[in-house]
């Protein structure tokens, strides 16, 4: 079935409290998607943001982002007052997330809500605290990660948010007696982090249930690696490559290439795949099972790393000293499917790939990705629409690309613009520089959007900012840039009925509309 969807981070939704959340704007966006005939809402990872405010460098592979908890819902529950919300600063620009301000204000308000909640639960049924039944159900269902996460975050707070490798040895090495004593002395702080995850889960499941009832699937995102400064790394031990002192032996990155003479040193700990194999890939089964409870479809980032990955000594200052190692290949995905059934995975397979990576993708039968901004460098490029395949997902650009408007005006080379203009029939087949310069940005953007929608690929995902025609101000992430990423927010009212009708009409031309919407249109003719 041909279908289409929109990439829109939760953080980019409008709202009064500094960042998008699971409030009314999320439900309104689902209504917008449904009206536009869309069947997929693609998100960035919903995990807590970490280094550089990136959702791909999180403190947990399982926890949800506290920033996304809807504060107005907590107010309706009597856990916050209007005065509590007005007392905090939420940033100066409603179109940009100010993460520094948000870090202070959000947690201050969430702690007030937690205090009110504990007060409500105090003394019930003869207990010091008797929490709601669904809270106990949540903590029981998620105890395999929640207990460690809450303890880890309480320890982070006690250690002034330092990386766990800088903690005192008994905490760093997880001395059972020391951790038990800390947990007993810090029950309220540990409870706070559980409370936030409980509210995150309840609110998100309400949004997801509403979306599914409207015929909208949620496409989530799973980074392949965990952050070095994460509860997963602190607890994981043998899951990762360790040296004799129990520290990470090697870390992840990319080799030197045309774009970077030193390569990219990401710093994420590498998995000890031999150990994972011994466990039957239990941790990965746990991780994917958890993700399937949050999302309907899963995009797996850096899919090539399951075939071959670049391993760099942890002491290196550049990626030059790394070498290629073999990943688990199909053995991992066979184990996942044996435990979880057919996997609704989309593989992020971008970049230069070894033949073995392409074979892994083919063997897995997962759809790969095609990105139009990569298509026009010359020759019979694999990203050109005529080279797409049915079992695939086409994008004008991903979150790492700039917007189509900015790409056409500033990012594309002269050769790329000339190639694209000819390919998209915006100019003669061999255009002059003057003919290319005469192509209007709006015309180029529309042609690129239609090229994506017209692709043979079963799915087309268009970033929201490209439907809106926004420029560089909406560029979500520039790889390698420190600060200023992940900040774009949409204006209130961006999801208008007029735009929904326009999107529905464009998608209907290429038979990508929600079947119910398309059937109604056909009956009306």
Predicted regions and their residues:
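Surface-exposed amphipathic alpha-helices with a cationic face
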Residues: 34, 204-212, 337, 361-362
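Catalytic domains of carbohydrate-active enzymes, especially glycoside hydrolases
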Residues: 24-49, 294-295, 452
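Outer-envelope exported proteins of Gram-negative bacteria
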Residues: 44, 217-219, 223, 297, ...
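Mature N-terminal, pre-catalytic/accessory segment of carbohydrate-active enzymes
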Residues: 1-37
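Conserved, well-ordered alpha-helix/loop/beta-strand core segments that scaffold catalytic motifs
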Residues: 193-226
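Alpha-amylase-like alpha-glycosidases and glucanotransferases acting on alpha-linked glucans and related
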Residues: 9, 18, 53-197, 201, ...
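Structured C-terminal cap/extension of enzyme domains
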Residues: 469-524
């Amino acid at each position: 079935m041909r279908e289409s969807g929109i990439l829109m981070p939760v953080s980019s939704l409008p709202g009064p409290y500094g960042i998008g959340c699971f409030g009314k704007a999320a439900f309104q966006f689902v209504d917008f998607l449904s009206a536009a005939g869309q069947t997929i809402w693609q998100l960035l990872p919903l995990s807590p943001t970490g280094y550089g405010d990136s959702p791909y460098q999180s403190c947990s592979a399982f926890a949800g982002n506290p920033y996304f908890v809807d504060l107005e819902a907590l107010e309706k529950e009597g856990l916050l007052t209007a005065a509590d919300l007005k007392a905090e600063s939420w940033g100066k620009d409603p179109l940009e997330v100010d993460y520094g301000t948000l870090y202070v204000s959000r947690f201050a308000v969430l702690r007030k809500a937690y205090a009110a909640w504990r007060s409500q639960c105090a003394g019930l049924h003869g207990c010091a605290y008797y929490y709601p039944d669904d809270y106990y159900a949540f903590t029981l269902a998620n105890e395999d990660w929640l207990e460690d996460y809450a303890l880890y975050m309480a320890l982070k707070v006690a250690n002034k948010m330092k990386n766990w490798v800088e903690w005192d040895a008994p905490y760093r090495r997880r001395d059972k007696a020391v951790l038990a004593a800390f947990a007993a002395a810090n029950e309220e702080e540990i409870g706070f982090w559980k409370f936030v995850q409980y509210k995150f889960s309840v609110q998100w499941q309400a949004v997801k249930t509403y979306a599914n009832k409207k015929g909208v699937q949620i496409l989530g995102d799973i980074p392949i690696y965990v952050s070095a400064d994460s509860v997963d790394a602190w607890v994981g031990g043998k899951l990762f490559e360790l040296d004799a002192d129990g520290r990470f032996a090697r870390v992840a990155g990319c080799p030197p290439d045309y774009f970077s003479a030193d390569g990219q040193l990401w710093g994420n700990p590498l998995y000890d795949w031999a150990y994972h194999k011994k466990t039957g890939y239990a941790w990965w089964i746990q991780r994917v099972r958890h993700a399937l409870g949050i999302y309907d479809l899963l995009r797996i980032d850096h899919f090539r790393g399951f075939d071959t990955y670049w391993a760099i000594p942890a002491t290196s200052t550049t990626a030059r000293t790394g070498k290629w190692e073999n990943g688990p290949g199909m053995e991992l995905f066979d184990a996942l499917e044996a435990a979880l059934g057919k996997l609704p995975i989309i593989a992020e397979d971008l970049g230069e790939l070894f033949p073995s990576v392409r074979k892994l993708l083919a063997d897995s039968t997962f759809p790969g990705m095609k990105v139009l901004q990569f298509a026009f460098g010359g020759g019979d490029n694999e990203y050109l629409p005529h080279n797409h395949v049915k079992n695939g997902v086409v994008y004008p650009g991903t979150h790492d690309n700039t917007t189509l408007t900015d790409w056409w005006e500033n990012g594309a080379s002269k050769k790329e613009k000339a190639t694209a203009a000819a390919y998209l029939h915006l100019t003669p087949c061999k255009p002059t520089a003057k003919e290319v310069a005469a192509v209007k940005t709006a015309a180029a953007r529309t042609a690129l959007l239609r090229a994506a929608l017209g692709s043979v690929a079963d799915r087309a995902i268009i970033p929201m900012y490209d439907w809106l025609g926004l420029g560089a101000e909406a560029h979500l992430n520039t790889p390698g840039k420190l600060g200023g990423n992940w900040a774009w927010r949409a204006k209130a009212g961006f999801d208008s009925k007029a735009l929904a009708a326009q999107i529905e009409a464009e998608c209907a031309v290429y038979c990508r509309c929600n079947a119910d919407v398309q059937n109604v249109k056909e009956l009306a003719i």
